[in-house]
């Protein structure tokens, strides 16, 4: 009888180890895609993430500008902000932006009165893509910003006095303009605390 109890005890311990090991393994796998998405060339330039169109849309705006010098009315651009999916999943779980989090700002021209469209406006042609990246190992400021235009394969970080200083001063959380991203606000597990 004692041998049977002992065997059941070993089986329970083995089951606990297998289940906890699976949990630990899933945690490691869940965090690894962030690092795998960020690639630099031999000159230290960020390589353009080719899969950015598959990222999670977290916010959009029309004509949102940060100064009085923006383009004239009627020439306003659409801005679509997308977040790399594994970074979004991490944010949903923790309310934090993990290292290697990337956002893409896709800037499109405004179209109107074409084909069957008689009123309103729509997203037309891609004008530029910019990437925000959290990489404290590489950038002392934590976040860096990159301009890729419409097809540049790699980009150096934009000078800190540009995008970084504005995001640092006005970003609602960790250099991120959450005030403009309703999907992030809704996904934030720390909201209301």
Tell me what each language-model feature is.
Residues 10-20:
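Hydrophobic membrane-insertion alpha-helices, especially the h-region
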Residues 32, 38-41, 48-56, 60, ...:
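Sequence context surrounding c-type heme c attachment/ligation sites in exported
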Residues 77-88:
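Short, structured beta-strand/loop micro-motifs enriched in basic residues and often containing a Trp
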